C-alpha cells in the first residue's frame, strides 16, 4: 500500500469523487498536478474556484450561463418556433454539435416517483410559459422509464396546445453491428423504421 502525504491523499480523494475517475486515474492526475509548474496549478485552481462563482442558470431556459446573459436565448438566428426539451444543461452541449438551430428548455431532471420526484419538482411551470411562439417541441430525453414517464406527462399536457410534439428517434448507431445491439433498441428501430424513397 502506498503512503501519500496528507495533502496529496486529500487531492486523490477529491479526484476519486468525480464520475468516471477511479483510484488509479485520481493518483495519476494528482501526481501530474504535483509535478506541474506553480502557474499551471494556480490557473487550474482559479478556474475551479471561478466556476461555481460565475456559472448560473438562465431564468428563461435554465441553460448554464455566465454574466447573466444567455447566448442561446439572445441569439437572433435561433428559431423561437422550435423548442428542444432536455433533462440537464449538459445535454445541450451534445445537441449543439448537431447544429440544432432552435432553443432549449432544461427540466432539471426527470419524473421519478421512486425517487420522490414529480412534475412539481421540475422546471415545467417556466416551460409552459414559453409556448406562445412555439410550433414544435422536441423531447430530447433519455429513453428510460423515467424519461418515458416524463415524455408521457409532457405530451399529455401539450395536447391543449396546437403544437407538434416529437421525440428523438431511437435506433441503431451508425457503424455498429446488429449482433451488438440490445433487444429494446432493435425493437424500437424496427417499430420506428423509415421508408427509403
Question: Model-found features: residue ranges?
Answer:
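Cys/His-rich Zn2+-binding cysteine-cluster or related metal-binding knuckle/ribbon modules and their
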Residues: 2-8, 17, 30-84, 88-92
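Conserved phosphate/pyrophosphate-binding and hydrolysis machinery centered on Walker-type P-loop NTPases
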Residues: 19, 38, 51, 63, ...
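Conserved, well-folded catalytic cores of nucleic-acid-processing
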Residues: 14, 18, 36, 51, ...
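Core recognition of P-loop NTPase motor domains used across DNA-transaction enzymes
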Residues: 40, 45-48, 59, 71-75, ...
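Extended interfacial segments that mediate partner engagement and assembly in macromolecular machines
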Residues: 26, 75-144
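S-adenosyl-L-methionine-dependent methyltransferase catalytic core, i.e., the SAM/SAH-binding region
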Residues: 8-17, 27-36, 152-168, 184
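Long C-terminal interaction/binding lobes of large macromolecular proteins
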Residues: 101, 128-197
Amino acid at each position: 500500500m502506498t503512503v501519500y502525504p496528507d495533502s496529496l491523499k486529500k487531492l486523490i480523494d477529491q479526484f476519486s469523487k468525480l464520475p468516471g475517475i477511479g483510484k488509479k486515474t485520481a493518483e495519476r492526475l494528482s501526481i501530474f498536478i504535483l509535478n506541474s509548474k506553480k502557474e499551471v496549478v494556480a490557473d487550474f485552481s482559479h478556474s475551479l474556484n471561478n466556476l461555481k462563482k460565475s456559472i448560473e442558470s438562465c431564468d428563461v431556459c435554465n441553460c448554464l450561463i455566465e454574466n447573466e446573459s444567455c447566448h442561446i436565448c439572445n441569439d437572433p438566428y435561433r428559431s423561437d418556433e422550435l423548442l428542444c426539451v432536455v433533462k440537464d444543461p449538459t445535454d445541450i452541449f451534445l445537441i449543439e454539435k448537431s447544429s440544432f438551430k432552435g432553443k432549449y428548455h432544461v427540466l432539471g431532471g426527470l419524473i421519478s416517483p421512486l425517487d420522490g420526484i414529480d412534475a412539481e419538482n421540475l422546471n415545467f411551470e417556466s416551460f409552459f410559459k414559453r409556448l406562445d411562439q412555439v410550433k414544435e417541441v422536441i423531447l430530447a430525453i433519455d429513453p428510460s422509464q423515467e424519461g418515458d414517464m416524463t415524455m408521457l406527462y409532457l405530451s399529455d399536457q401539450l395536447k391543449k396546445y396546437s403544437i407538434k410534439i416529437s421525440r428523438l428517434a431511437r435506433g441503431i448507431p451508425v457503424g455498429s453491428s446488429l449482433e451488438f445491439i440490445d433487444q429494446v433498441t432493435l425493437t424500437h428501430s424496427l417499430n420506428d423504421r423509415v421508408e427509403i424513397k
